[in-house]
Amino acid sequence: MKYLLPTAAAGLLLLAAQPAMAANTGGYATTDGGEVSGAVKKTARSMKEIVDIIEAAQVDSKGKKVKGGAYPLIITYSGNEDSLIKAAEKNICGQWSKDARGVQIKEFTKGTYYPGHQWLIRQLRCLDCETLLTLWYVICALAICQAARKHGDAIRIDNSPNVWIDHNEIFAKNFECKGTPDNDTTFESAVDIKKGSTNVTVSVSVKEVGTLVNLSRLFFPFRIQRYRAFRLPVSCLP
């Protein structure tokens, strides 16, 4: 299913921390705030710059890859990509054949933190991450971000333990696009958790839709020891 997001922006907070039970939240990491020890501060004006900053943090000064990342990151986003959204709105089904656009965090466990600034993320994928706490306000648009050709999910967690997905706001409208797989670009879900992911917390997340799409898609065998209910508007209920 292709879906369109009206032009909008939202702040994102993404923090990776050591696993510790949080008494106040019931999650797998604390939300006491503060900066991770040794964190490097960066500023990004585009999604590509965010991707480049994360890639650079995975190698040392000699260019050698460091397991788990070379240092924690604090990334402040100061850009705005609303113009790309407006352009894509004119040709929704034409976005599917393009390369996916999104932020992927792969084998990075040092910690990443995005202060809440005006920004829009198209798609987030966490692959082989550990002890990752995601706490954010985010709006996703899969059709516009050209994500569905590879995997049609707004947020996808693969083979990653101790993950907390919190305070997500995902807007979606369904579009049938003839000539794509199943005529709906094989969109699966807003949140896809699979491939050995364990100890996953999903909480206080809202999905606004024009017509019903899957809220979450869970692949077994894996353990979700804490799966807290999404807060859904009435319009989303079947």
Curated annotation (Swiss-Prot):
Gene3D superfamilies: Single-stranded right-handed beta-helix, Pectin lyase-like (2.160.20.10). Its EC number is 4.2.2.2. Residues 1-22 form the signal peptide. GO terms for biological process: pectin catabolic process. Keywords: Calcium, Lyase, Metal-binding, Signal. InterPro entries: Pec_lyase (IPR002022), Pectin_lyas_fold (IPR012334), Pectin_lyase_fold/virulence (IPR011050). Disulfide bonds: none annotated. Binds 1 Ca(2+) ion per subunit. Induction: By pectin. It catalyses: Eliminative cleavage of (1->4)-alpha-D-galacturonan to give oligosaccharides with 4-deoxy-alpha-D-galact-4-enuronosyl groups at their non-reducing ends. Its cofactor is Ca(2+). GO terms for molecular function: metal ion binding; pectate lyase activity. Ca(2+) binds at residues 153, 188, 192. Pathway: Glycan metabolism; pectin degradation; 2-dehydro-3-deoxy-D-gluconate from pectin: step 2/5. SUPFAM superfamilies: Pectin lyase-like. Involved in maceration and soft-rotting of plant tissue. Belongs to the polysaccharide lyase 1 family. This is Putative pectate lyase X. The gene is PEL X.
